[in-house]
From Swiss-Prot:
A GO term for molecular function: cysteine-type deubiquitinase activity
EC id: 3.4.19.12
Region (Interaction with IKBKG/NEMO): 470-684
Residue ranges of the region described as Disordered: 309-353, 392-411
Binding annotation for Zn(2+) 2: 799, 802, 825, 833
Similarity field: Belongs to the peptidase C19 family.
Any single Gene Ontology cellular-component annotation: centrosome
GO biological process: innate immune response; negative regulation of canonical NF-kappaB signal transduction; negative regulation of canonical Wnt signaling pathway; negative regulation of inflammatory response; negative regulation of interleukin-18-mediated signaling pathway; negative regulation of JNK cascade; negative regulation of NF-kappaB transcription factor activity; negative regulation of non-canonical NF-kappaB signal transduction
Keywords: Cell membrane, Cell projection, Cytoplasm, Cytoskeleton, Hydrolase, Immunity, Innate immunity, Membrane, Metal-binding, Microtubule, Phosphoprotein, Protease, Repeat, Thiol protease, Ubl conjugation, Ubl conjugation pathway, Wnt signaling pathway, Zinc
Membrane topology: Peripheral membrane protein
Gene designation: CYLD
Protein name listed in UniProt: Ubiquitin carboxyl-terminal hydrolase CYLD
Amino acid sequence: MSSGLWSQDKVTSPYWEERVFYLLLQECSVTDKQTQKLLKVPKGSIGQYIQDRSVGHSRIPSAKGKKNRIGLKILEQPHAVLFVDEKDVVEINEKFTELLLAITNCEERFSLFKNRNRLSKGLQIDVGCPVKVQLRSGEEKFPGVVRFRGPLLAERTVSGIFFGVELLEEGRGQGFTDGVYQGKQLFQCDEDCGVFVALDKLELIEDDDTALESDYAGPGDTMQVELPPLEINSRVSLKVGETIESGTVIFCDVLPGKESLGYFVGVDMDNPIGNWDGRFDGVQLCSFACVESTILLHINDIIPALSESVTQERRPPKLAFMSRGVGDKGSSSHNKPKATGSTSDPGNRNRSELFYTLNGSSVDSQPQSKSKNTWYIDEVAEDPAKSLTEISTDFDRSSPPLQPPPVNSLSTENRFHSLPFSLTKMPNTNGSIGHSPLSLSAQSVMEELNTAPVQESPPLAMPPGNSHGLEVGSLAEVKENPPFYGVIRWIGQPPGLNEVLAGLELEDECAGCTDGTFRGTRYFTCALKKALFVKLKSCRPDSRFASLQPVSNQIERCNSLAFGGYLSEVVEENTPPKMEKEGLEIMIGKKKGIQGHYNSCYLDSTLFCLFAFSSVLDTVLLRPKEKNDVEYYSETQELLRTEIVNPLRIYGYVCATKIMKLRKILEKVEAASGFTSEEKDPEEFLNILFHHILRVEPLLKIRSAGQKVQDCYFYQIFMEKNEKVGVPTIQQLLEWSFINSNLKFAEAPSCLIIQMPRFGKDFKLFKKIFPSLELNITDLLEDTPRQCRICGGLAMYECRECYDDPDISAGKIKQFCKTCNTQVHLHPKRLNHKYNPVSLPKDLPDWDWRHGCIPCQNMELFAVLCIETSHYVAFVKYGKDDSAWLFFDSMADRDGGQNGFNIPQVTPCPEVGEYLKMSLEDLHSLDSRRIQGCARRLLCDAYMCMYQSPTMSLYK
């Protein structure tokens, strides 16, 4: 492709810029006239059409027979002006330009450009649209809803359009934002439930495959398919669990102010299933509604009873009715209240049966001696009549309670009530908290109760009279048949109640439970159908762990009884690491890796790096005990081998109790303290374990300027910051450090652990460091043949002062043969250099290497230990491919509160390979915040890089 680079200076002076854009169809190679460097403008780059002020247009007439050329300002390189042939570009409109410009990878951008259908659909994606998001290549797409559409940074003539998406369902917790970008709130969602992505990562969910619209439709949702209105008095049915309930239509219309949501239907049910009083937002829509037998639902959830096939749905509903809380799929059946005179008469209905568990539900003050609800299960000996709560006198008694059908998954007298609509909150397009269409009907009933905005409420202190010692984070149970087990996440007294409640996160889902909200206010956050609010006095310490209650000591708590659900295996048989696909299948997933507990991440991540996919240090696990070893040598070695390393390699998981055993052993060392509770550094752990307990042969032997050899287990890079260097490689850092300190390896190491240059945990010398996949240490070894930097022959002299000379192999250690050394130092600027002879084996004749191939000593990167804000994580390589990387976090998730459990996780991160293929210049210019997935932590937060020698590990 022919093109010319006009200038690297700003072009605003000689040119007019027009809002016309072109996309390059071929790669363009041009020369910078200032630096004479070859620049590449890849296929898929976008340029803005510029107009020559003097000529009046930028289509430069070419020689006869040649096509015109177009002047473009490349948007990714705003100071570069190119002139390209018309045949090598295609004009694109501004809206497409904005969508494509957000895709930083030109190859992926060009691929999307060719998919015109998908690109056109991108114009339709707006706030409120249901989408699928591709977070990582090769993985499944997660469902979500667009909450933001627009540029992230409006700093250019034209900016790329990004989409802020709230991830739903299985995608929750897989994101990286709560809607904030560079300190600016662009939308609102829960932490780590949002992402900002370009169009290439999005797929608009069509009508046929959406399962989200009815609960997540935006105000301008064009996907909503409306059914024709149903006639008043027509018979209809709806599905409740596994059964069909019937009723008569008394209302069918759109809701005032919510017309875009489509038709809603009010149904007078044959059985007492209902919650609607005929009002919406204070407007009386229907005068025939009986609160306890009338229900308001979206028309998509109604089955017209036109024939005997009423059991078949008119069309597949957008969301299964069960998912809105009518019942629990785990229930075998649903018992319905009998339509007796006492229950069918509204005046005789028991209004106290239901104190709410659900967000937006209500309470009544009339206690009933024979009705005991799960919500208020008090002490076993307590009078059931006292088990119902009292509410404040200002409660609007004219607002009837919601009375859904009970579910028989609980005992007969203590049924859990589940409402036949969703009360799940969802952020509106403006970021405020709204409700799905089906929750709007409940809102009208509860408008008196839900006047307070939904917000995170701080936990209130537990009253001192609590005899059980329960607190936030305690494992508790609620006596039922069967009992409920969970972790107390909140304790306090909600407004309008004179009872202290406990909010529990249950172990298992239960119909009727929420995600942490009570009466419209959020007190904590958990998975849907897992939050239960009960009287605090109804709670008891979890009887399954009676010996551990109450527990305040996190060290003593870390035992096999408390961690009963997280225990790992003991494996006696020596097990080499499984690599490639086999290792991947064993290791990836949640509850994989090493479980973290109580500031153990430094130790978890270090052990995972050293042993998960490398056997270079397996000799540490096998050396027999010697006379001079400490008394707990065998105990430590056996623990490491059979309870940590072998189970990790076979099952991919190690419980925190095993690590606590090791931490207690580390505490026995006289020079050590705080290993069971405090945050430590990996180097401190390695020093105590390797030197004081296992007496491991030092991994490194280093000599400084001919002095005595020094032994160590890892090498810390010390150096001053070089402002000229953008992104250094590990190879460069190691060579710089050795040259400046005049160091050499006395022996080739089998394992090389390099600590990155930084001042403390927080201050990094470089914003990014490129982890060299292969490390050539040949020039850093003493008594080793080395190549002349000029002719490739046997080097006899090394010159440290030539190291920074850019004219001779810039950035390389300078060693020369006799002839080349003389020639190099004849130059006037090198006349005063002091060079030294290279240390060579004494029995090595010069001529044996003069024309031969001098072997290199290379080491392979097998793991990187990273730290960010005092939390250590690990990257390990499980195969030969550059993309064969796994990311490990010992505390990736949490089960329960303060006395809960960390859930470790290992995830593949193939995106790392793409960044390791980038040039250092491209990596330097790349905004760290734009680095996808886990790769940012690898490139920006490296703390230790671990290398192994495939050959030397056979001998050491």
